[in-house]
Amino acid sequence: MHISRPRRVAVLSVHTSPLAQPGTGDAGGMNVYVLQSAIQLAKRGVEVEIFTRATSSADAPVVDAAPGVRVRNIAAGPFEGLDKADLPTQLCAFVAGVLREEARHEPGYYSLIHSHYWLSGQVGWLARDRWGVPLVHTAHTLAAVKNLSLAEGDTPEPAARQIGEQQVVAESDRLVANTTDEAKALHELYGADPTRIDVVAPGADLTRYRPGDRDSARASLGLDPGEIVVTFVGRIQPLKAPDVLLRAAAEVISRSPGLPLRILVVGGPSGTGLARPDVLIELARSLGITAQVTFLPPQAPERLADVYRASDLVAVPSYSESFGLVAIEAQACGTPVIAADVGGLGVAVRNGETGLLVQGHRTEDWAGALESLVTAPTRLAELAAQAPRHAENFSWEHTADGLLESYRKAAVNYNNGTGPSDFSPRRARGLWRLRRTGGVRT
C-alpha cells in the first residue's frame, strides 16, 4: 500500500524530553516512543522536529538526536523545580516558543503536527489553527481511565486535565491509540468519533533487546547465578505498583523460606505517594525481606537489556498502562512477564504463553501467580522460549508505518474539510501572511 509522506512533522512533547533517561522523573515509555518513532519516521524520509520544554540551563537550544531528528528545547518557566501539575501555567510561554520558531520559516514549513499527552495537545490545537496543517494526537494516558483504577495513596487526576483532554480529542484531526481498549475508552469516555481513531501499537528496538547469555548478564550486574531473579523496571510511583510485587514476594518467601528469590527494583522517583526509593526500602524492611531485595537506579538502554536478560521473570503490576513497553522489551530479551491485566498489558503479554496476567492487585492473588512460576523452572523456560516470538510482532518500524498511514488520513480529512474543525487552511495561511507582512495583504 502506498503511503504518502509528509515532508516535515512537528512533534510536541511538552512535559518530558525524548532525550531524558526513562525511569526518572516523568520520563518513561512515552519518551522512548517519541524518540524511537521519530527515528523510524526519519528513516522513511520524514524530517522530525521535536519540541520539548527545557529543564536545565545547560540544555542546548537544538540537539540533533539522530539523522533527520532534531530536538528543540523551549525555555518556558523555571528550568528546575517545576512540578508537572504546574506545567499548564507555562503553556503560553511554550506556545510562544514554538510559534516563534515556525515564524522563522515560510508558511507550510511543517506539514503536520503530532502531539503527545494532553498538554502537548493543547499546544498542537493552537498551532494547527495558526499553521493550517493537520493535528494528530496520541494521549498515552487518560485521566478518566487512571481515575477508575487509582492505587492506594495516589492522587486523582484533576478535572482540569480531563476537560483539557476532552478539548484535544474534539479538535484533533486523527487520534492514535495504542490498543483497541484505548480506542474504546476514547470513544466511550471522551466521545471521540471511532472513524477518526487509528490503533497503532508501540514497539521495541529489536536490534537492542534480544536474547543473550544470562550468566554473563548477571555477572555484569553482580547478581548471584543461582538465584531466581524477578525484576521490576519503571518509575517508583503508586501507579506502577512496585509495592504490590514486594508484598507478593514476601508472601512467597514466607511460604518457602529456602527459595532463593531475588527481587530487583530498577527505577527512580516520580509522582506522588510511593515516590522515593527509601519508602520501598522501608517497606522491604517491614516485610522482613531486605536481604532479598536489590535496588538499582534507572539504566541506559544498553544496560537495561542486560537487566532483562539477567532476570527469570519481569513484573509489571501497574494499576493502569496504555500499553507497557517494559513487557515487550523483556519478552524480546527472552524473559517472560507477570503483569496486571489492565489496559494494553493484555495485548503486550500473551497470557499463558509468554507470561501470566493477574486480575486485580490483591497480595494473595499476586503471590499465588508469582509462586506458580518461580517454583516451576520448566514452565518458566517454556514461557521464555515463546516470549521473543511474540515480541517480534512489535517493532518501531511497524509503529512508524502505522503513524504514516494515520498522517495520510489526517491530511485527507483536513484538506477535504472533513476534520473536527471548520477552520479553513487557506484562511490560516492568509492570517499568517498578514502577520508576516505587517498587516499588508500580498
From Swiss-Prot:
Substrates-to-products reaction catalysed: 1D-myo-inositol 3-phosphate + UDP-N-acetyl-alpha-D-glucosamine = 1D-myo-inositol 2-acetamido-2-deoxy-alpha-D-glucopyranoside 3-phosphate + UDP + H(+)
Molecular function terms from GO: acetylglucosaminyltransferase activity; D-inositol-3-phosphate glycosyltransferase activity; magnesium ion binding
Domain of life: Bacteria
UniProt keyword annotations, A-Z: Glycosyltransferase, Magnesium, Metal-binding, Transferase
GO terms for biological process, alphabetical: mycothiol biosynthetic process
Positions with a binding annotation for Mg(2+): Y308, R309, S311, T335
Enzyme Commission number(s): 2.4.1.250
Record's keyword annotation contains Iron: no
UniProt entry tagged with the keyword RNA-binding: no
Any one Pfam family match given in the protein's UniProt record, by short name: Glycos_transf_1
Residues reported in the UniProt entry to bind UDP-N-acetyl-alpha-D-glucosamine: Q21, P22, G29, R235, K240, Q299, E321, E329
Binding of 1D-myo-inositol 3-phosphate, residues: H15, D26, A27, G28, G29, M30, N31, K84, Y117, T141, R161
EC category: transferase
Family indicated by similarity: Belongs to the glycosyltransferase group 1 family. MshA subfamily.
Subunit note: Homodimer.
Biological function: Catalyzes the transfer of a N-acetyl-glucosamine moiety to 1D-myo-inositol 3-phosphate to produce 1D-myo-inositol 2-acetamido-2-deoxy-glucopyranoside 3-phosphate in the mycothiol biosynthesis pathway.
PANTHER family registered for this protein in UniProt: D-INOSITOL 3-PHOSPHATE GLYCOSYLTRANSFERASE, GLYCOSYLTRANSFERASE
Protein name, UniProt field: D-inositol 3-phosphate glycosyltransferase
Organism classification: Bacteria, Bacillati, Actinomycetota, Actinomycetes, Mycobacteriales
Protein's gene: mshA
